[in-house]
Amino acid sequence: MRTQSLLLLGALLAVGSQLPAVFGRKKGEKSGGCPPDDGPCLLSVPDQCVEDSQCPLTRKCCYRACFRQCVPRVSVKLGSCPEDQLRCLSPMNHLCHKDSDCSGKKRCCHSACGRDCRDPARGTAPGCPGQANSDLGSVALHLSWGPTERVHDGRPGALPAGQHYLYQRWFQPSDNHWPADTSLQPIHPWFLLLGVKVHSLSSEEGLCITPVLCTTAIRASHPS
């Protein structure tokens, strides 16, 4: 089952059968971002919340240890993290954990070998998903795809710049339409999307549409 699921997911991404449906800040969503979650999925725990409005005061509904729970929000600076085209040959090493660890306008960005402080990418449109600014938090976008969906020019849809991790949802070969959430923070041991190239375009409705070709590597493990 794991091999079939992974092959089908890879085929969908390769032939362009995914269509991003990206949205801005949802009703009831609080400002700020979610703290990094680098821990493994040790237990299968039900979600304690679904959205920010279910959390008290300034807490946000974020994934921690692979299930959603109310946690203190973190301050997130404006601008998107630059793309990292490098391949890491050394062990993962985090030099920062959140934007406030970085000086000035620098952001704590996830690079090939871990998080470090970097200047935000130039020319990014404010409010576009993937930037994880104070209005969008760390959830970058919502996407869905089906076997007949294509962007207008027939090429695959692409994710905003950066490394995006699919939340804990297992893709089944029988699924004709599978919605998924992605995060800029690693959520192990689920799907990991790498090598995404994108040019974000803002529509009149404030959405970000990314009809560009991307190359993607996938790693997955089945939930226990």
Curated annotation (Swiss-Prot):
Localization: Secreted
Induction summary: By p53/TP53.
InterPro entries, A to Z: Elafin-like_sf, WAP_dom, WAP_four-disulfide_core
Matches recorded under Gene3D superfamilies: Elafin-like
A GO cellular-component term linked to this record: extracellular space
Record-annotated WAP domain positions: 27-73, 74-121
Coiled-coil spans in chain: none
One of the GO biological process terms: innate immune response
GO molecular function: serine-type endopeptidase inhibitor activity
Keyword field: Disulfide bond, Protease inhibitor, Repeat, Secreted, Serine protease inhibitor, Signal
Pfam families: WAP
Predominant location category: secreted
Disulfide bonds: 34-62, 41-66, 49-61, 55-70, 81-109, 88-113, 96-108, 102-117
SUPFAM superfamilies to which the protein is assigned, alphabetical: Elafin-like
Signal peptide bounds: 1-24
Tagged with keyword Ligase: no
Domain of life: Eukaryota
General function of this protein: Putative acid-stable proteinase inhibitor.
Annotated protein name in UniProt: WAP four-disulfide core domain protein 5
Originating gene: WFDC5
